[in-house]
Amino acid sequence: MLGALLLLLQATPPRPVAPAPREQPALAVLIVVDQMRPDYFTRFGPQFTGGFRRILDQGILYLDGRQDHAMTETAPGNSTLLSGRSPSSTGILSNDLGVNDPLYPIVGGGWGDAASPMRFQGTTLYDWMLAKDPATRVLSISRKDRAAILPVGRARRDVYWWTRGRWGTSRYYGDSLPAWLQRYNARPGWRRLAGAAWTPLLPDAAYAELDSVPWENRGKEFTFPHVAPSDTTALAARIVYFPWMDSLTLDAALEGTRQLGLGRRSEGPDLLVVGLSTTDRVGHDYGPDSKEMHDQLLRLDRWLAWFADSLGRLVPSDRIIWSLTSDHGIQDWVEHTVERGGAADRPTMQPMTLRLRAAMQDRWGSSFGIAQEDGLLYGDTAAMRARGVDIGRLADSLAAEARLLPGVWRVYTPRTLTRALRADAEARIWRRGIPVTQGWLVAASVRQGYVWERTDHGSTTLADQRVPIAFWGMGIPASRVSRPVSTTAIGPTLAAFLGIHPTEPVTGIVLPEVVPSGGARLPRRLPPGLHP
């Protein structure tokens, strides 16, 4: 009898033990590294020992993240990150039509362009958090105004950016800086870097790149060391050209977290967004294949580890959910591509744009706001149409001219883009990039290797679209994912992890590697401007 009972017990499978409930997140952190390419993780991974190393060892890293829209610039890119939507829906076409707003000057008369999120349409993760918990706090800070403003949409909260010598904001957010930030600005901080030299972090043997490349930095001061101005007035403007700007941004973010009490409420999580802009500056000055870029990323890797460790002393590290991405990628420099025997050039639509402006001014007494950027020729087509301009014929004529430019392989007009098949992947990229309210005439795409005018990104090429997307912390399993993933997934994925839902339709999906039961579904009917 006893033997039979023992056999029965052995044959009975043990009851599964329910997993321990995950502790509620206290803080969601988004790090945005401007112009960060995903291949930097593989190129420099063996030398990463800090924050990037933690992503490689402990996080989910999507190596084919994409800003899958046209006009791959900082403003539209940042507008996608926490909104779950493309620029066609957020209303942010480009940097030029991003956050610049003369109605909201810098607080206290500080240096910098007036700025606000008034062009931004819809909601972001912070609005969704606020809908569930009205006491939710947020801090968004960056060297660039658009990188601080757009991830959190229209929220009138703690949003700050570098205003040449101090951290500031615009009158959209208030009439004065908070006392804690005034005290922080008064510290010596960045002034101690006057006359400092940027030299390589590691011995020369650790760098495969050449140091002396004459087309870098416009042919001036293109070798190490790079010395900062000794005059603090000059340094206040020039420090953005040095890696230290990122460390200053991280330090300010840490102080803001401390002063605002982020992550220390028992009621629910808070949000911290940190935009790190120096990688973009170094990329524009020296290129993505430069020794300077290599060194910048090594330094940022170490600073991110310091930041994470310091933040973990303010907020329990096991209650922080981290994410990292970028606003856009960058192509190899034209000069490098040509040197390697590839096809490359810098086409421009500026001459045809200037001729059109002059013709409109002569004929109608107005240029109708006609401008061009990154292959898009745009303007107030509604006003043109009201004056009798045949928009269709004009667009067709301009498109024929654009097709003759070097490297151009696809050209759309409003009519042809509307009629393009869903299978036309390039058309989908342009549809996602142009806000529904934006008037335009011609959209031209260039082949890989071709860069519009004096820019280094902004096109629809994969190199400009590709960015890393990473999540780590709070038990997220480490893995690397190679399939394409849109940056519009970041906001909905963080929302699902926090246990909240978007308050409006979004096209970004919940990434199953981060939230396995998130339910990656699109709404049945998409409002105008939402393009999957």
Model-derived features with residue positions:
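Second-shell loop/turn segments in exported
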Residues: 18-19, 36-43, 67-68, 111-116, ...
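Metal-dependent active-site segment of extracytoplasmic phospho-/sulfohydrolases and closely related
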Residues: 51, 299-341, 422-424, 444, ...
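Short secondary-structure boundary/capping segments
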Residues: 45-48, 153-162, 286-294, 329-351
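Active-site-proximal N-terminal segment of extracellular/periplasmic enzymes that hydrolyze or transfer
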Residues: 14-60
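His/Asp/Glu-rich, glycine-adjacent segments
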Residues: 86, 91-268, 277-284, 403-410, ...
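Active-site neighborhoods of enzymes that stabilize oxyanions during catalysis
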Residues: 106, 118-126, 132, 139, ...
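A long, amphipathic alpha-helix that forms part
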Residues: 40-41, 239-265, 279-320, 395-397, ...
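Short, structured active-site-proximal loop/turn typified by the sulfatase FGly-forming signature C/S-X-P-X-R
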Residues: 42-89, 130, 135-141
